[in-house]
């Protein structure tokens, strides 16, 4: 079992979740079960999958969970775009969160590469 708190991808994705919760709190109430809920679930899925994967015994299993986290990360990116297009996020908010998304994505790619090379 791995200590997930030692992975930068986990720390960065955890921060992204908190940021997504903050900005979606300002979305229209009508979006609570739409974009707000979906965006929160997708963002939270990133560190949750990392945590679950880290608890698995083998590197192959961990790599699969990291890969799922990558998919959730891409989902969040589109949702950020959509939220800006709908006027729920300002351009500055979207760009700030997109920059954080990019950092998470890079760290996930690095982690996936490292875990995939483990025996």
Give residue spans per PLM region.
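Short, C-terminally biased terminal segments at protein or domain edges
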Residues: 1-119
